[in-house]
Amino acid sequence: MFTLKLFVYTVVIFFVSLFIFGFLSNDPRRNPGREE
């Protein structure tokens, strides 16, 4: 059970890192076509 929980936490952290990286890469301030 501990290995399964560790695997789940690893996958969650991995996807969160991808989400944060994608959000920073797609910063609205870097997109000239989007003004807010």
From Swiss-Prot:
Homology family: Belongs to the PsbI family.
Compartment(s): Plastid membrane
Species of the source: Cuscuta reflexa
Protein's recorded name: Photosystem II reaction center protein I
Alphabetical UniProt keywords: Membrane, Photosynthesis, Photosystem II, Plastid, Reaction center, Transmembrane, Transmembrane helix
One CC-aspect GO term: photosystem II reaction center
Protein origin, superkingdom: Eukaryota
InterPro entries in the record: PSII_PsbI, PSII_PsbI_sf
UniProt cross-references to Pfam families, sorted A to Z: PsbI (PF02532)
Function noted in UniProt: One of the components of the core complex of photosystem II (PSII), required for its stability and/or assembly. PSII is a light-driven water:plastoquinone oxidoreductase that uses light energy to abstract electrons from H(2)O, generating O(2) and a proton gradient subsequently used for ATP formation. It consists of a core antenna complex that captures photons, and an electron transfer chain that converts photonic excitation into a charge separation.
Transmembrane segments: 4-24
Keyword Disulfide bond: no
GO biological process: photosynthesis
Membrane topology value: Single-pass membrane protein
Quaternary structure note: PSII is composed of 1 copy each of membrane proteins PsbA, PsbB, PsbC, PsbD, PsbE, PsbF, PsbH, PsbI, PsbJ, PsbK, PsbL, PsbM, PsbT, PsbX, PsbY, PsbZ, Psb30/Ycf12, at least 3 peripheral proteins of the oxygen-evolving complex and a large number of cofactors. It forms dimeric complexes.
PANTHER family: PHOTOSYSTEM II REACTION CENTER PROTEIN I (PTHR35772:SF1)
